[in-house]
Each structure stands twice: as structure tokens, then as C-alpha cells.
Swiss-Prot record:
It catalyses: beta-D-4-deoxy-Delta(4)-GlcpA-(1->3)-beta-D-GalpNAc6S + H2O = N-acetyl-beta-D-galactosamine 6-sulfate + 5-dehydro-4-deoxy-D-glucuronate. It comes from the Bacteria. It holds the Pfam family Glyco_hydro_88. The active site is at residues 115, 175. Induction: Constitutively expressed. Expression level increases in the presence of glycosaminoglycan. This is Unsaturated chondroitin disaccharide hydrolase. Optimum temperature is 37 degrees Celsius. Monomer. Its EC number is 3.2.1.180. It is an enzyme of class 3 (hydrolase).
Length: 398
């Protein structure tokens, strides 16, 4: 077992701001799901067998084909909704999507990047787990093989964007703590140790480099392509190289417990607590994060609801594994309820118009001006996943 570097675990500041809140009831969660599904059904008619753009434009998604890194989240929303109500209309459309994903991997359409997990886990892995569909399994394993092509032995990580091996692209990103779950699944299905080894190596490379000593996270981290030595952490989506991009922090909060399920390394619990406490201590009054954790109330900056929704899923997952004696366990429980309640009551969509998101006020890419204070499809997915998690004993797609 490899070592994870020691990180600072902050004490949760003023835990009563969470502990004094009321837990969501099952009826409240069910009402939130029903409300979300009303918009989902409108969007099904709007998208047809196509997909939403990654983010909305003036709070309306445009329609696109299956060529973005985000398309799997739409199909994931369909599967989550199907698991809630067993509507065969949802199943049929989601399955047609899965066939589109099989075609995409067979023809290698717009797949030269690291986001194979985001594409294939909530779409194809989901269908295999729900229906045992062999085409869904075929697509998933082929996608895992494609992701394996980006593995760099020198440094032991999956390279993010760009041409493989080039110095200016020789880096990992924290997002891939979710993408490597595709490799764990491939190992689970095939028994081939190569998938698990790459996933494990990438996890440790991330834990020891992209996470700072204070448990905040860089977005990306560079390595030397000749030696594999760690070089530097920088941002691409965050405010600065020194700040902590909220969604990146949330990828860590969710990616760690997902990996802990498969690795069972106790060091991961400490890392989770460090990253989660850092996130919770920088939430504003309404408990929904700004797009970078450097900002809080009065900054005039937009929220990123997708980061908060993702963090809720991560906390919910890790509560399964935290020992009962953990002093923060009760606070985590109340914190995730408080965050999800705020999303439901203050940030969920109320206008039933074709193309509207389920969740408002997200940020796609602040520096490039894309999807700023807009809905985004991963925010919709993780919001709906969080609701389903709170509603039933749900078998993960990840």
C-alpha cells in the first residue's frame, strides 16, 4: 500500500450552523424529485434522442449531438428517473443513448481526452447495473480501454487534455478521481488487474500532488515527462493557482469515497476529512458554495451549485464508511442535509419551460465566460443523484 502524504484536517468551524438545521424528510425529498422530473419530461421532448449542451444559455440548453464530454450526465439523469418511477419511456430513450455511446466508442468520436468516466459511467455502466445489458457492458469496457491509453508510466497518472507525452500537457486533473471509477468497474467485470493498478496509481498520484498540504486542491498538476517528478500545481478553471476551485474540491470530496469503496485505504478517510472540512468551512450563509472557495458573501461572485450538489453526494457516500466514533460524522450528516435543502429551496428551477435546467446558478468556466451563472448538465445530474440517494437505498453507477 502506498503512502498518502499528511494533510491538515481543519476543525469544522461552528458546527451548530449545521447541527441546528432540520433534516430533510422523505416527503420533502420526494416532492423535490417530482418537481425535477416535471422539467426532465419536458426536456425529453425538447432533446428527443439528442443531448443538451454542457451549460445553458440564458438558462436554456441548446440541443446537440453526442460529441461533448458531458453527454453522459443527461443519460444518467434518465436512468436516475427510471429507477425512481420505472417509466419504460425513460428506459427506452436512455437505452437509445447507450447505443449512441457504443457507436461513439466504436468510431472513436471526440474521445481523445480524460473524461471517459463522465461519459460512460452514468450512461452505459448505469444500464449494465440496472438491466445487465451486454451492449452497455461492451461500451463501458471499450471506454475503459480508451482511457487506459492516456496513462503515463512516468508519474503514474492519467494525462488530462492534449497530445500525449508533451511537456505542456503532461498533467493530471482532480476531476479524474471520478473518471478512474470506470477502470475500477472494468477490473470488477474482467478481473484484469491492469485496470485496477492504473486507477490506484492515479489515485495516489492525485492525493499526493493535486491536494495541497492544507487539504485544498489545485485543479491540475504537472509532472516532468522525462523523469515523472512532480513539478507544480496550477489552475485552469479556478480563480488562481493559489485558490481552490469549488468544483475541483467537490470532485475530491466525491472521488475519495468512491475510491475508498474499492481500495479500503484508511489514509483516504483522513484525506476526505481534510478536503471536506476545508469545503464546509468556506461555505457562505446559505451553504451553497461560490464558484471558487476564495469567495464568500459580499464578493459579488456567482455560486456554483454543481459543486455543492457533487459534495453532497460525496459526503453521503463516505458516511457509509466513517466509524461511528468519528467526531465529525453527525456534523457531516446535518451538513449534507443543509446543503441539499438550500439547493432544493433556493436554487432548483421553478419555470417549466423546454430546455430549462433542473438546477440554476452554476458555473462552467469562469475564465472563458462559458456557462457563468447558468445551469449545467452535471449539476442537474448530481442534484438528482443526491435526491435519489436521500430517497432510497440506491446502487451506485460509479
Amino acid at each position: 500500500m502506498m503512502k498518502i502524504k499528511p494533510v491538515k484536517v481543519e476543525s469544522i468551524e461552528n458546527p451548530k450552523r449545521f447541527l441546528n438545521s432540520r433534516l430533510l424528510t422523505k416527503i420533502e425529498v420526494e416532492e423535490a424529485i417530482e418537481k425535477a422530473l416535471k422539467q426532465l419530461y419536458i426536456n425529453i421532448d425538447y432533446f428527443g434522442e439528442e443531448y443538451p449542451t454542457p451549460a445553458t444559455f440564458n438558462n436554456i440548453y441548446k440541443v446537440m449531438d453526442n460529441t461533448e464530454w458531458t453527454n453522459g450526465f443527461w443519460t444518467g439523469c434518465l436512468w436516475l428517473a427510471y429507477e425512481y418511477n420505472q417509466d419504460k419511456k425513460l428506459k427506452n430513450i436512455a437505452h437509445k443513448n447507450v447505443l449512441s455511446f457504443l457507436n461513439r466508442i466504436n468510431n472513436r468520436i471526440a474521445l481523445d481526452h480524460h473524461d471517459l468516466g463522465f461519459l460512460y459511467t452514468p450512461s452505459c455502466t448505469a444500464e449494465y447495473r440496472i438491466n445487465g445489458d451486454v451492449k452497455a457492458l461492451e461500451a463501458t469496457i471499450k471506454a475503459a480501454d480508451k482511457l487506459m491509453e492516456r496513462y503515463q508510466e512516468k508519474g503514474g497518472f492519467i494525462q488530462a487534455w492534449g497530445e500525449l507525452g508533451y511537456k505542456e500537457h503532461y498533467r493530471l486533473i482532480i476531476d479524474c478521481l471520478l473518471n478512474i471509477q470506470l477502470l475500477f468497474f472494468a477490473y470488477e467485470q474482467t478481473g484484469d488487474e491492469k485496470y485496477r493498478q492504473v486507477a490506484v496509481n492515479h489515485f495516489y498520484a492525485s492525493a499526493n500532488n493535486v491536494v495541497r498540504d492544507d487539504s485544498s486542491a489545485f485543479h491540475t498538476f504537472y509532472f516532468d515527462p522525462e523523469t515523472g517528478e512532480p513539478l507544480k500545481g496550477v489552475t485552469r478553471q479556478g480563480y488562481s493557482d493559489e485558490s481552490s476551485w469549488a468544483r475541483g474540491q467537490a470532485w475530491g470530496i466525491y472521488g475519495i469515497p468512491l475510491s475508498y469503496r474499492k481500495m479500503k485505504d484508511y489514509q483516504q478517510i483522513i484525506l476526505f476529512k481534510g478536503m471536506t472540512n476545508y469545503f464546509l468551512n468556506r461555505l457562505p450563509e446559505d451553504k451553497v458554495s461560490y464558484w471558487d472557495l476564495i469567495f464568500t458573501d459580499g464578493s459579488g461572485q456567482p455560486r456554483d451549485t454543481s459543486a455543492t450538489a457533487t459534495a453532497v453526494c460525496g459526503i453521503h457516500e463516505m458516511l457509509k464508511y466513517l466509524p461511528e466514533v468519528d467526531p465529525d460524522k453527525e456534523t457531516y450528516k446535518y451538513a449534507m442535509h443543509t446543503m441539499l435543502r438550500s439547493l432544493i429551496e433556493q436554487y432548483s428551477n421553478n419555470e417549466l419551460i423546454a430546455g430549462r435546467p433542473l438546477l440554476l446558478h452554476g458555473v462552467y468556466s469562469w475564465h472563458s465566460g462559458k456557462g457563468v451563472d447558468e445551469g449545467n448538465i452535471w449539476g442537474d445530474y448530481y442534484y438528482l443523484e443526491a435526491l435519489i440517494r436521500f430517497y432510497k437505498d440506491w446502487e451506485l453507477y460509479w
